[in-house]
Amino acid sequence: MTRDLEKLVAQTILQGFDAQYGRFLEVTAGAQQRFEQADWPAVQQAMKQRIHLYDHHVGLVVEQLRCITGIRCDDADFLARVKHIYTRLLPDYPRFEIAESFFNSVYCRLFNHRELTPDKLFVFSSQPEQRFREIPRPIAKTFVPTDGWQNMLEKLLSDVPLRLPWEDLPRDIGYIVAYLQRTFSAEQLAQATLQMANELFYRNKAAWLVGKLSLPDGIFPFLLPIHHNERGALFIDTCLTSQADASIVFGFARSYFMVYAPLPSALVAWLRDILPGKTTAELYLAIGCQKHSKTEYYREYLHYIAESEEQFIIAPGVKGMVMLVFTLPSFDRVFKVIKDRFAPQKEVSAERVMACYQLVKEHDRVGRMADTQEYENFVIDKHRISSELLDELWREVPDKLEDLGDRLVIRHLYMERRMTPLNLYLEQANAQQLHDVIEEYGNAIKQLAAANIFPGDMLFKNFGVTRHGRVVFYDYDEICYMTEVNFRKIPPPRHPEDELAAEPWYSVAPNDVFPEEFPHFLCSDRHIRTLFEEMHGDLFCADYWRALQQRIREGHIEDVYAYRRRKRFSQRADPRYTTAENDSGFCRNPA
């Protein structure tokens, strides 16, 4: 009887995951219709809905198990036996890897993230890495330019399943061919093979054709973002073939793609060729499997810990007033713990901070806010913690620590991509880097604002610089919606002595913001202030922010491009007469 109950529980968990992933695919499949109808508010709503599906279905399964098993549901040894049976259900299961993560989530919900040991949950996968020699549904279709690139691209684009007309397909094909001829030699293009993913990748206002361009000297990404104009006609906005550009398109600071992937492991394996710099966790994250990516991030962390002898240290940069941040010297992640007590000037609660981090996960991050993974009861061997960090932990977050002798448990933390703090980057930057990064910094603020996000604290220390030179915001405790802020001009002084007074001569409400004050606390360096005013002086005007607010209230959703504006075909000269692409510097207001 007990054996039958264990089998029933294992099957219930797997069926619960089937239901979750079925709904995940259902929401994803609606991306084509939302794109064709230009229903951008529905795009944003579907993104949030899909993120919530996972936790919702975990909750449903947990309630089912409590009804089925009674008190045995709280028996860790019982669930360890269930895990053994569950493992035997997976060898022929197409989404085994995410099913394992779903089991982990159910277990953690039942046991409040306690007793997290390999015998009770899938710390590592139970299945071999290369599961499927043959897949039931091909990931991609192959094209060969036997009759020339023009004809091949015409066939490729004519097969796109979108039910909208093309604005000018011959023109777009001409743009693509001209770009390829500038980028690669005629000999390379003659020997090329192109593989294109069968499914479109939807995000924001674009549907992406994603492909692999195989040339004699290697494999290159081949990315074509499809947009449509105000009349509902399709056009290709650019062609991207560099790994750096592809990495940004699939970057950690962007919303997840909606791509129909009934076999996600096969899609991830296929993408790895064009995104060799991305880890397994990052690829699962890019296609929207954020909970499984969390599992993979943790596995990457465990692998790094096992292969290194580094100690955890306090992260470089200015210490935060809300978060304690630490890292490993050569690891590409940081760990952030909410402090038990905040500095007096920080009028927020821990609950508010956590809500801000959840808002960022669900919101369109427009390439300017880093995604995070949330962990509970994170265990670290004490000998791997530097004495300075250990002292800092006990000083700042004692309520979130549990001492297990040779190990330390941190009850709650966030893991986030490590970047160079902007304030540290500025100290080392040469003249060109300084110009570029200040332009990027202003662009980041503008793009966040256009996406209805006001960063709140815009000091340099709250932004990071990625390896691609992009500026990304990562301090979320003061963010709010743009529509919640009251942008004001500073009233003229009533008397000359008002300007010398310690207190302002005008009233200030909690949500009041005075953009005229930004230069004083953002740019103490005169040279940096001059650069910023030249490129982004409009940020110091209340009218600029009010105009953005009005567009947001009217329901306007801005176009977001995962590449520089100068790369857009519409921004270039006629490609038939262009011999080289302008590739210098950052553009003004890239989106």
Curated annotation (Swiss-Prot):
Query: Predominant location of this chain?
Result: cytoplasm
Q: Name one GO biological process term.
A: tricarboxylic acid cycle
* Taxonomy, superkingdom: Bacteria
Stated EC number for the protein is 2.7.11.5, 3.1.3.-
Q: Which UniProt keywords apply?
A: ATP-binding, Cytoplasm, Glyoxylate bypass, Hydrolase, Kinase, Nucleotide-binding, Protein phosphatase, Serine/threonine-protein kinase, Transferase, Tricarboxylic acid cycle
- The signal sequence is none
* Localization terms from the record: Cytoplasm
Report the catalytic activity.
Answer: L-seryl-[isocitrate dehydrogenase] + ATP = O-phospho-L-seryl-[isocitrate dehydrogenase] + ADP + H(+)
Q: Which Gene Ontology MF annotations are present?
A: [isocitrate dehydrogenase (NADP+)] kinase activity; AMP binding; ATP binding; phosphoprotein phosphatase activity; protein serine/threonine kinase activity
User: Single GO cellular component annotation?
Assistant: cytoplasm
Binding annotation for ATP: A315, P316, G317, V318, K319, G320, M321, K336
Active-site residues per Swiss-Prot or TrEMBL entry: D371
Concerning its family, UniProt says: Belongs to the AceK family.
Q: What does this protein do?
A: Bifunctional enzyme which can phosphorylate or dephosphorylate isocitrate dehydrogenase (IDH) on a specific serine residue. This is a regulatory mechanism which enables bacteria to bypass the Krebs cycle via the glyoxylate shunt in response to the source of carbon. When bacteria are grown on glucose, IDH is fully active and unphosphorylated, but when grown on acetate or ethanol, the activity of IDH declines drastically concomitant with its phosphorylation.
What is the official name of this protein in its record?
Answer: Isocitrate dehydrogenase kinase/phosphatase
